[in-house]
Amino acid sequence: MAHAGSGGSAGRGFGGSRWGRSGSGGHEKLPVHVEDALTYLDQVKIRFGSDPATYNGFLEIMKEFKSQSIDTPGVIRRVSQLFHEHPDLIVGFNAFLPLGYRIDIPKNGKLNIQSPLSSQDNSHSHGDCGEDFKQMSYKEDRGQVPLESDSVEFNNAISYVNKIKTRFLDHPEIYRSFLEILHTYQKEQLHTKGRPFRGMSEEEVFTEVANLFRGQEDLLSEFGQFLPEAKRSLFTGNGSCEMNSGQKNEEKSLEHNKKRSRPSLLRPVSAPAKKKMKLRGTKDLSIAAVGKYGTLQEFSFFDKVRRVLKSQEVYENFLRCIALFNQELVSGSELLQLVSPFLGKFPELFAQFKSFLGVKELSFAPPMSDRSGDGISREIDYASCKRIGSSYRALPKTYQQPKCSGRTAICKEVLNDTWVSFPSWSEDSTFVSSKKTPYEEQLHRCEDERFELDVVLETNLATIRVLESVQKKLSRMAPEDQEKLRLDDCLGGTSEVIQRRAIHRIYGDKAPEVIESLKRNPATAVPVVLKRLKAKEEEWREAQQGFNKIWREQYEKAYLKSLDHQAVNFKQNDTKALRSKSLLNEIESVYDEHQEQHSEGRSAPSSEPHLIFVYEDRQILEDAAALISYYVKRQPAIQKEDQGTIRQLLHRFLPSLFFSQQCPGTSDDSADERDRDRDSAEPERRRPTDEKPPADASPEPPKVLDDVYSLFFANNNWYFFLRLHQTLCARLLKIYRQAQKQLLEHRREQEREQLLCEGRREKAADPAMELRLKQPSEVELEEYYPAFLDMVRSLLEGSIDPTQYEDTLREMFTIHAYIGFTMDKLVQNIARQLHHLVSDDVCLKVVELYLNEQQRGAAGGNLSSRCVRAARETSYQWKAERCMADENCFKVMFLQRRGQVIMTIELLDTEEAQTEDPVEVQHLARYVEQYVGSEGASSSSTEGFLLKPVFLQRNLKKFRRWQCEQVRAMRGEAKSSWKRLMGVESACDVDCRFRLGTHKMVFIVNSEDYMYRRGTLCRAKQVQPLVLLRHHRHFEEWHGRWLEDNVTVAAAGLVQDWLMGEEEEDMVPCKTLCETAHVHGLPVTRYRVQYSRRPASP
């Protein structure tokens, strides 16, 4: 599949190799192996051992070329300039140049550079090659056909084939015959290249197609546009005369071979022309012009790809990938990776594409056009086939099965010829969690490399064994018999493929000649080939040992990281989640959800918390305070006074909120603080071992009270600090519990091993330690949590590298270590918030207000007596809202219950209060106090009479007349009302007050209203039977009407039989007894069931 054109393209075609051995410009080059490159590199290294700058410069050139920073002419220019004093190295570099490039150094000392893109050789002085290379210019090959014309011819051919397929949809044999004619013609054209033409002529092709398309004049005339010469000669009658002349035949075949070249999938994309080329019409097309771009199979392949991709833009992107390959910008393996998103879901097309790529490697395989049924298999649309699950498709019944002569009767019965595997790869999934992490990809890549090397070694070893057996056989034969011995295609073994691959890997393009020598003259060829195979075996084994060290290092670096799939994105996500904006958005979103529920009527408006957090271990609070103090103390940006205030908040104010005692050893003295930081490691190191301190070491802690709470109204900064502090405590608790869990598992494992090793004399060692698969840990399991705290301190002060910190955490806590990766960032954010708390006036006022209200008993207490403190807590809330007029107000409660502390946070709605005028609020508060108090009630009774009346005289007359009527009516009802009030006892002692904060009326405890009439209980007892009887009759009447409308007689009988236990199927044998009784004077029927045996318990 080389490209067409007189000059050819630099590098490779669609299936060619990138590098070739040195040779003449027109000769075929042998492939370069890795050992050749290493040998050349060793020569350069030895030559410039005393000049490392030159050697490093050569390596830099190779790196730039590998990264595609420079092209092939640039490599030639720079290498020639670098090795201008060493012509042997320049000549040796020819082995690694692409096909068509060569550097010659004649005796005159001038460089002759041959390039496929230049019309003639460029000669350069050997002494001044650097300046000459700057002036080198490469001209484009003028023999190439313009890209616009190529695409027109290609599309016309594809459109014509599709038109034939659509026209003869009901007669597929005609379409198949047409393809066979063109396949035969194209195959003969390819196989007769360079020899006198003996195949079908264009006239014969046109005649057969005319017979095939009889009655379809439009198709025949359009096909004649591809064969203009054949059509003209056929109608003029000169075709036979030309074919009878042998000399003309030979001349025509030579001219035909000049015009044709090996087809390729796509021509290399050349630079755009300055002028737009005028496109040729379809009347100028010929089958020779179309055939030089590829076979009909390749045309059909691209047509299928265009149909399955559907979008023209996607199809053009697919073509751009192939253009990159033809321009030598990507390799073959990289091209497969580029097209896998396009063809990955179409295995047939992808396999066909790979067969186009590997023409040389698969040269010993039968040609694709000769395979039985290949054209039909490519026409199968697996998307419309019958499915089983998601991985199998059924072949259509019209599919012609390939013939197999080795099958027996039982093979035909049991082997599958219908269902085809149609896998869906996990890499094609868009589900994020199914993707591999970079560390997993690295391990898979190492495994793939090891597997490929093992396959190469085993293939080579298997070939050595086969040839050794042949050599032993030859050693036992006479010389005459050795000359007569011939080997088959398996070369003395049982497999043809293994030996061929091994020999191709070593000898490259010369492998067919070597294999032919082994078949014809094994006595001479076997020893030579066997020696070469054994030398390669030793060389590859040594290389494998070096690779094993590299792979082992990669495994050790990536193994623990590959196990933890959460750590990949944890850092980035955690940084975003701990920002102040994210924390505020979280509670605001919960607040909005509650407001929507209240507005829609799904829940009653009530004061409920928006966020709830639980502190399960009080000791964690001390560890968190110690870490924060350790970092704050070492920050020069925080002044000494602020550091003292922060210590007060951490060790006095926070413990009071969490019902905890002041941390031992904390005081205002900086010396005591330093001693506490230095000695804090000892008590912490004893915690994971569950060792209890002696009784006289510390005083007995006070008894913990349950169901007590603290109330704290906070602003934004305090909310941010409390959230970050809770996050720190939660992560420390997870690490601590994970350390305890691993310690318990280790102790159980030790006890199990001790039981197993009681009968042994020697102590059983850890197999992983014995095999050196596991390194002994530097930290004991009992010290994991204290060691973790020490590592965090070291990370905060910068004495440990973050990468080392993460690797050590992974060794200790495996997949649970990711929680501690951002511990330093979390502590730094907390310290930053603490600095805001001690430097902001509003934050300090919030603390001062809490302490004052705590002394008044308005900031917490016993939960059972909270209603007594309701008015004081409301006053505290009102003061806090006025203090935080420009910020959000958060109601934070700390509830102690069952040894745990529960923190609830509620965002208060202060918008209405903020919109009111403070002066009006003060007047309203004064009015409420006067209205509720006794003084205000007595003084306000006479103030209204001093003002002028606000009503008219005529309305007053009407009102007086209505008032007289009401008085007369009341006098008439007085007697009856007096009778109704006889025997009635009532009291009106209810008391209420106004809440100053919310302006709502609240009823006082132990004040109520009641009314009771004497003798009503006896009368109710007398009337109750009559009421029950009336209700019972109403229900019976309704029930009877419902039964008549909805229940049939048969259904009622079945229910009665079931109730009486007369249906014995699936029932325990029993007997139902009916008893009549009276309840409240009403006759009722009671049913009692007696079982003949006890039913089974559920």
Curated annotation (Swiss-Prot):
One of its GO terms (biological process) is skeletal muscle tissue development. Residues 1-26, 238-274, 661-702 are annotated as: Disordered. One of its GO terms (molecular function) is transcription corepressor activity. Pfam families: PAH, Sin3_corepress, Sin3a_C. Gene3D superfamilies: Paired amphipathic helix. InterPro entries: HDAC_interact_dom (IPR013194), PAH (IPR003822), PAH_sf (IPR036600), Sin3-like (IPR039774), Sin3_C (IPR031693). Its main location: nucleus. It is found in: Nucleus. The modification Phosphoserine is found at residues 667, 670. Component of the SIN3B complex, which includes SIN3B, HDAC2 or HDAC1, PHF12 and MORF4L1. Interacts with FOXK1/MNF, MXI, MAD, NCOR1 and SAP30. Interaction with SUDS3 enhances the interaction with HDAC1 to form a complex. Interacts with CRY1, HCFC1, MAD3, MAD4, MAEL, REST, RNF220 and SETDB1. Interacts with C6orf89. Interacts with MYT1L. Acts as a transcriptional repressor. Interacts with MXI1 to repress MYC responsive genes and antagonize MYC oncogenic activities. Interacts with MAD-MAX heterodimers by binding to MAD. The heterodimer then represses transcription by tethering SIN3B to DNA. Also forms a complex with FOXK1 which represses transcription. With FOXK1, regulates cell cycle progression probably by repressing cell cycle inhibitor genes expression. This is Paired amphipathic helix protein Sin3b. The gene is Sin3b.
